[in-house]
Amino acid sequence: MRDFQGIDANVKDWLRKAREIILDSFNLSLDVETKSGPTDLVTNVDKEVERFYIQQIQNAYPEAKILGEETSKIHPLTNMEGLVFILDPIDGTMNFVKQKRNFASMIAVYYNNRPLLGYIYDIIRDELYWGGPVYDAVYCNDYQLAIPTDSILSEGLVQLCRPFVMNDSYGFRRVVDASAGLRMYGCAGLEFINVLTGRCICYASTLRPWDLAAGKILAETLDLVVEAIDVKETNMLSSKVVLVATKNAEKDITKLISI
C-alpha cells in the first residue's frame, strides 16, 4: 500500500480534532433522534463528526470510498475495492447521551479488502488504540500493547450484549456460567479494548460494519480470534453476530453455544 504512514498521521489528526468537537458539545443542548428503535439513538454530534471525517477524507483522498454509520443508507458501499474508510463517529451513543462517558470514535482503513489500520479512540480518557498489520503492532497512545495471555474461559470475564443475556441467545448463559463473570458496557469499541488489553477474555454481540471494522483489525493484529458465529463468510459490509476472544476461550465458547 502507498503512504500508509501518511494516512496514519492524517487519521490521528482527524480523531484529535473530532475529540474537540465532541467535548465542546458538552456545553450545548443535544438534538437526539431514534433510528431503528428507542435504544438506537443518533445525535446532531454524531452527524457533525461524521460530516467532518467525510470532508477530511474527501479532501485528502478523493478517490477513497467511505462507509459511515449515519450516511450508510444514503451512500451505501457495495464493495471493498480500492482505499476504503469505515467510520463510527460516536460508538455508544446511548452512553454519550446519558452518561457523557463510555463511548468511542472509530475509524478503519482497508485497501482492496485488506485490513491496513484500525483506530478506537476512548474520547473521555484520551486513549487512542491504533495499529494494524502494516505496523504488526497495536498501541495505546505511544505504548505498545503485548499480545494478551491466551487464557481459557474460566479464567476471564466475558462481555455480551444485553439480548444475548436476557434472551439466552445462542445459549450464551452457559458461557457466562463457565466464566469468571459478566460485564456489559454498551460500546463495542470499549469492549474490544477490554479484550485487546486482557481485561476481559471475550466479547460477543451483533455488530454492523462500523461497529466491527476497527476492532477486528486491532484484535487480529494481536493474534485474537474474530469470527462470525451466525454466518460462514465474513463480509465486512454486512451485519453479523461476532465473537472476539483468546484462542483458548474461543474453543471453550464454541463447545457451549448453539449455532
What are these regions (language model features)?
Residues 1-90:
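N-terminal subdomain of lithium-sensitive/metallo-dependent phosphomonoesterases centered on the IMPase/IPPase/PAP
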Residues 78-135:
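DPxDG-like acidic metal-binding loop motif
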Residues 123-154:
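ATP-dependent small-molecule kinase catalytic core of the GHMP/sugar-kinase superfamily
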Residues 18, 22-25, 46, 57, ...:
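Residue-level signal for inorganic ion chemistry
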Residues 28-29, 103, 131-136, 220, ...:
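A short, compositionally biased
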Residues 148-259:
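An extended, acidic
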